């Protein structure tokens, strides 16, 4: 009788899921792809390597491969994820002769969204006449959105409140005005502290009124 020749195929990956950081990175996937020749059901010769192909899906994922002694090493690249949701994909490895497949899930974390707050005043000192008067000052209160640590868009304005302290000084009709009452005594001082409603940033205007 003629000998019956068959092959036992094996295909495996060293990971079922690969996770990537939002900034993007490269990770390795090791594939073992082999066949064992059998004659009349018994192993004949050594284990042989079998080629594989890869199909990758998902936004921002790509791959390159290099040969190993018993399969292939796939280098999987995830580009930066700037979305505020996780980025998902997959890579399917197919063994060329047997059509066996192994599927590996690719997950990438959502972008890290933070805000940087600023609060400045101009000028930082105000001087008032002894007779009393109202003065205004400039306030810049903003927030800058950052995605993965880099600026996204332009700064936007945030609201703020002002607290005035010191004898004879009160807040005026707006959050950026100070009223000094008439001073009949020695020189006096106070402060106007501006605080952003988001981010809790502060800036201080020093107030002085002449004797």
Language model feature labels by segment:
Residues 85-97, 187-198, 205:
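A short beta-strand micro-motif common to beta-rich folds, especially ectodomain repeats
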Residues 1-7, 104-113, 205-211:
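Interdomain boundary/hinge segments at the C-termini of tandem beta-sandwich modules
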Residues 13, 36-75, 138-140, 144-177:
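Surface-exposed binding patches on compact interaction domains or structured appendages
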Residues 2-34, 114-142:
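Beta-sheet-dominated interaction scaffolds and their linkers
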Residues 35, 80, 95-97, 143, ...:
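Surface-exposed loop/turn motifs at beta-strand-loop junctions within extracellular Ig-like
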Residues 79-85, 181-186:
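Short, surface-exposed loop/turn segments at beta-strand-coil junctions that are enriched for proline
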Residues 60, 97-99, 166-168, 198-200:
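Solvent-exposed strand-loop boundary residues in beta-sheet-rich modules
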Residues 15, 26, 88, 101-103, ...:
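Surface-exposed or flexible loop/turn and strand-edge residues in extracellular/cell-surface modules
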């Amino acid at each position: 009788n003629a000998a019956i020749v068959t092959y036992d195929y094996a295909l495996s990956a060293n990971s079922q899921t690969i996770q990537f950081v939002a900034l993007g990175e490269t990770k390795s996937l090791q594939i073992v792809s082999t066949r064992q020749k059998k004659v009349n059901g018994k192993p004949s010769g050594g284990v042989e390597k079998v080629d594989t192909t890869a199909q990758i899906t998902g936004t921002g994922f790509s791959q390159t491969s290099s040969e190993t002694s018993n399969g292939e090493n796939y280098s999987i690249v995830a580009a930066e994820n700037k979305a505020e949701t996780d980025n998902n994909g997959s890579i399917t490895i197919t063994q060329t002769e047997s059509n066996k497949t192994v599927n590996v899930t690719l997950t990438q974390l959502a972008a890290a969204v933070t805000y940087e707050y600023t609060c400045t005043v101009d000028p930082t000192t105000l001087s008032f006449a002894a007779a009393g008067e109202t003065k205004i000052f400039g306030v810049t209160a903003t927030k800058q959105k950052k995605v993965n640590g880099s600026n996204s868009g332009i700064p936007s304005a945030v609201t703020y409140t002002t607290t005035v302290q010191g004898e004879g000084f009160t807040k005026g009709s707006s959050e950026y005005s100070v009223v000094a009452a008439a001073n009949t005594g020695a020189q006096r001082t106070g402060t106007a502290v501006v605080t952003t409603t988001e981010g809790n940033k502060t800036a201080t205007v020093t107030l002085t009124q002449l004797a």
